[in-house]
A protein has these predicted regions:
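Alpha/beta enzyme core
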Residues: 3-15, 26-51, 59-75, 82-200, ...
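Cofactor-binding active-site loop characterized by glycine-rich and histidine/acidic residues
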Residues: 55
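Thr-Gly-centered strand-to-loop micro-motif
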Residues: 204-206
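Extended, intrinsically disordered, low-complexity segments
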Residues: 241-286
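Short amphipathic alpha-helical segments at helix-loop
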Residues: 18, 104, 252-256
């Protein structure tokens, strides 16, 4: 079914697992992402940046996600990631996205609260979920670089949540956007403190750089949404580079693109198995 974020994270909280949120960098990769989640036995969050949503067309993402959710009988959330503008968020909601993120993390706390309240009011009236962020994630995403991340201040997080009824909260705990050649040192004492103080589902951004050995500990400490973007981009691009370098110029474009999407399938299937603690899952079980 096509669901909102709150619905799938409530179930994840009840059973104690984490849901993978995978960034779609084009429309081509989305069907294989959803098939991978179906085969792994998990819901999936397909998320897009604002710029990717505009490149592909929001209605196109909505149509594919709704169709495949119904055809494959798998729970799919379509989420707008790191939106800073109310107009962008409103457009996504009006086009049919089931979840949005308002990122006011760079704003003073009071301004973040005021703008988040407006988003929540509009979204919840339309059964759309809202994620917000306290603290910042370092690294580069969509051409925007944040030199250093800022750890989430637990007191600010509590103050924010007292004022704003968000459905999930992204926290700064040491991860970085765009990191794939090294691994992140997570601040587990902070994660544990946040989990002890906050009842809302917590979200990890910049998940590609997180050591897979840490996944289970993150789940036990309330991480219910785990974002993966760069790893999918690298897998798809690496496969594309190989295909276009090794095949003739008149090779079917379909035959060149399919291995790229299969590489994305493998990443989503593998990660989803780890998020579910299903160690028997293996890459490529299609």
């Amino acid at each position: 079914m096509y669901k909102n974020l709150k619905e799938v994270l409530t179930e994840a909280e009840r059973i104690n697992y984490t849901v993978g949120a995978f960034n779609a960098h084009n429309l081509e990769m989305v069907p294989d992402m959803i098939r991978a989640a179906k085969d792994a036995g998990s819901p999936i969050i397909i998320q897009t940046s604002v710029s990717t949503a505009r490149y592909v067309g929001m209605k196109n993402f909505v149509a594919v996600c709704k169709t495949m959710a119904n055809d494959l009988l798998v729970d799919v959330v379509l989420h707008l990631d790191h939106a800073k503008s109310f107009d962008d968020i409103k457009e996504a909601i009006d086009m049919g996205y089931s979840s949005v993120m308002f990122d006011g993390s760079s704003l003073p706390l009071r301004e973040n609260i005021e703008k988040a309240l407006r988003v929540v009011e509009y979204a919840h009236a339309r059964n759309v979920s809202v994620e917000c962020e306290i603290g910042t994630i370092g690294g580069t995403e969509e051409g925007v670089t944040v030199a250093e991340g800022v750890y989430t201040d637990p007191k600010q997080a509590i103050e924010f949540l007292k004022a704003v009824d968000v459905d999930a909260l992204a926290v700064g705990v040491g991860t970085h956007h765009g990191q794939f050649q090294s691994k992140t040192e997570l601040n587990f004492p902070l994660i544990e403190e946040l989990h002890s103080l906050i009842t809302k589902p917590l979200v990890i951004h910049g998940g590609t750089g997180v050591n897979e050995a840490d996944y289970a500990r993150l789940t036990e400490n309330g991480i219910r949404k785990f974002n993966v973007g760069t790893e999918l981009l690298v897998a798809w691009t690496r496969a594309a580079k190989h295909q276009f370098e090794e095949t003739e110029l008149n090779n079917s474009l379909r035959n060149n693109i399919m291995p790229c999407n299969e590489a994305v399938y493998d990443v989503v299937y593998h990660k989803t198995g780890l998020f579910l603690n299903k160690e028997h899952l293996t890459v490529g079980a299609k």
